[in-house]
Regions:
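Active-site acidic Asp-centered loop
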Residues: 118-120
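Conserved core of the sugar-phosphate nucleotidyltransferase
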Residues: 125-233
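Structural motif
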Residues: 8-10, 116, 145, 179
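Short, well-formed alpha-helical segments that are part of the catalytic scaffolds
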Residues: 27-35, 45-64
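Conserved N-terminal catalytic core of the sugar/cofactor nucleotidyltransferase
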Residues: 1-9, 13-17, 53-114, 127, ...
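Hydrophobic/basic alpha-helical segments enriched in Actinobacteria
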Residues: 43-46, 224-225
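N-terminal nucleotide-binding beta1-loop-alpha1 segment
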Residues: 1-41
């Protein structure tokens, strides 16, 4: 088993050019035509630019600057190969569903004891933020998931649309980063699929965790510690 850290970045997804041009993304522009993907009318989300850099480029630069990753796997289309630095950065072909892309990425790094999972749409990510998250994750934890308090998120990103979980401890927003033990999650691939299918509904996610968790969530009695304990039971 490898001892260093692997990184998995899921970079799938497309957006219609018309939808992108009508959006209100600040200072955003389409990626170069050479990397537009399936014709001029469809753009690869990971290659959309904020300022002068593609979203994927921002994430990869931050990962590289940490000096922590022995291997980085990017799950996406062939057009992304241009942005990678082999041999330590490799491309895994994307699949049709986001959770299948996560599973494919974990399969590629299953010999590592820990893998950092990131999405490619993190325009404000920095090497320091990644390092602090990695350092905060207990080395023996099978899953660490990034969350932030609503007041901190709103102060940093005012007017940004997001979904908040209202818990007894406060309101929280989910991050786009996880530290995982690949083998442990791969053994529960079906559970990952169910979580992914319900990811847009906090109620359905709570139901997946059991009626007791759902009741506590509905009555605003659920705490972060309760979620952690239930996750330990499920994993």
């Amino acid at each position: 088993m490898r001892t260093n850290l692997a990184v998995v970045v899921t970079a799938g997804g497309r957006i219609a050019r018309a939808d992108f041009l009508s959006s209100s993304l600040p200072e955003a522009s389409a990626a170069a035509e050479d990397y537009a993907g399936e014709g001029r009318h469809v753009l690869i989300k990971a290659l959309l630019k904020t300022g002068r850099r593609a979203l994927l480029e921002i994430v990869l630069d931050a990962v590289r600057a940490t000096g922590l990753a022995e291997r980085t796997v990017i799950v996406g289309s062939a057009e992304l190969q241009h942005w990678l630095n082999p041999p330590h950065e490799t491309l895994v072909p994307e699949l049709s569903e986001a959770h299948e892309n996560l599973i494919a990425g974990l399969e590629a790094v299953k010999e590592y004891p820990r893998a950092l999972y990131l999405t490619s749409d993190l325009p404000f990510v920095t090497a320091d933020a990644i390092k602090r998250f990695v350092d905060a994750c207990p080395p023996d934890a099978q899953l660490c998931y990034a969350i932030a308090r609503r007041e901190a998120f709103d102060a940093r990103f005012p007017d940004s649309p997001s979904t908040y979980a209202r818990l007894r401890d406060g309101e929280f927003v989910a991050g786009c980063a996880m530290m995982v033990e690949p083998a442990a999650l791969l053994a529960r691939a079906e559970w990952i699929r169910q979580v992914a299918q319900r990811r847009k509904s906090l109620w359905r996610l709570a139901l997946l965790a059991g009626w007791h968790v759902l009741w506590k969530y509905a009555t605003r009695q659920l705490r972060v510690a309760d979620v952690e304990r239930r996750a330990e039971q499920l994993l």
